[in-house]
A protein has these predicted regions:
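Active/ligand-binding-proximal structured segments within catalytic/core domains
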Residues: 1-42
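Non-catalytic interaction/regulatory segments
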Residues: 36, 42-133
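Divalent metal-coordination and catalytic microenvironments
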Residues: 12, 40, 113, 140, ...
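Terminal appendage regions of diverse proteins
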Residues: 25, 35, 119-236
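Generic non-transmembrane alpha-helical segments
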Residues: 17-24, 55, 59, 63, ...
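Active-site phosphate-binding and catalytic loops of NTP-dependent enzymes
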Residues: 24-29, 68-69, 203
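Ordered, soluble secondary-structure elements with a strong preference for glycine-centered loop motifs
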Residues: 4-9, 46-54, 149-153, 222-229
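Gly/Ser/Thr-rich helix-start
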Residues: 31, 114, 146
């Protein structure tokens, strides 16, 4: 229950952070909660950049550390709309003449879900993945509280394992991976060059014989399928 509450309150905080970073036009297109992770679909006119995602994460955690009270009250729909506007309706319009209003700082939504009593209870927020799911909608996957800690520990384990495998420090991983990838591409080109040379050598050794007035080339060669196609094409 606590994990779900942290993730639910986390969607409100991340949406507010997205508004601060990207602009007030940001609107929630949907969300999904679980105990391990949660996701928030955001309406935005263009792709969110990695730098913007980083800033959203910083702002979200700042709002958590401010320990803002989560205020919940019930108001008539008319009064709530007059006070807060239609931005109340994030992810859908709830039915009924009265609305349950959830407010965390400047973020105010009509919401019937369970929440933490303050943003500080959410704990750390870690944005895990960004996905462009359709035109105008970006999906942010995140973890909050102990789930965020577990996600960060998992990421750290992957980094440590990768660094140990390549025998480098973690901060040198990007450069090392790029170097290995460049070397792999160069070696692949060299292999292709040598295969072409082998095909040329095999071709130079072929001799034809006449069978019923037709020249036929028969030879068993130990080459790859690609090289065999090259040789056959040259003979033809």
């Amino acid at each position: 229950r606590w994990a779900l509450m942290r993730h639910h309150s986390g969607t409100h905080v991340i949406l507010r952070a997205a508004k601060e970073v990207l602009g007030p036009h940001i609107h929630q297109a949907g969300s999904q909660l679980s105990t391990d992770t949660a996701r928030l679909d955001i309406r935005h006119y263009t792709h969110i950049t990695p730098e913007q995602l980083k800033q959203i994460e910083i702002v979200a955690n700042r709002l958590v550390m401010e320990n803002l009270p989560v205020m919940i009250k019930v108001e008539s729909r008319t009064k709530a709309e007059q006070k807060f506007g239609f931005a109340l309706y994030q992810g859908g319009v709830p039915p009924g003449k009265e609305l349950r209003i959830v407010q965390m700082g400047a973020e105010v939504q009509a919401c019937a879900g369970t929440h933490c009593q303050s943003t500080g209870e959410i704990g750390p927020i870690k944005l895990l993945r960004l996905e462009h799911i359709q035109d105008g909608v970006e999906r942010v996957e995140f973890a909050a509280g102990f789930a965020a800690l577990e996600a960060m520990q998992h990421i750290q384990t992957l980094l440590n394992t990768s660094a140990d495998t390549l025998s480098v420090q973690i901060e040198n991983l990007p450069a090392s991976v790029e170097r290995f990838f460049t070397e792999w591409k160069d070696q692949r080109k060299e292999i292709e060059r040598l295969r072409a040379k082998i095909a040329d050598l095999e071709l130079s050794r072929l001799e034809g014989v006449m069978v019923n007035g037709t020249e036929v080339v028969i030879k068993q060669v130990d080459v790859s399928r690609k090289e065999l196609v090259t040789v056959a094409g040259a003979v033809a």
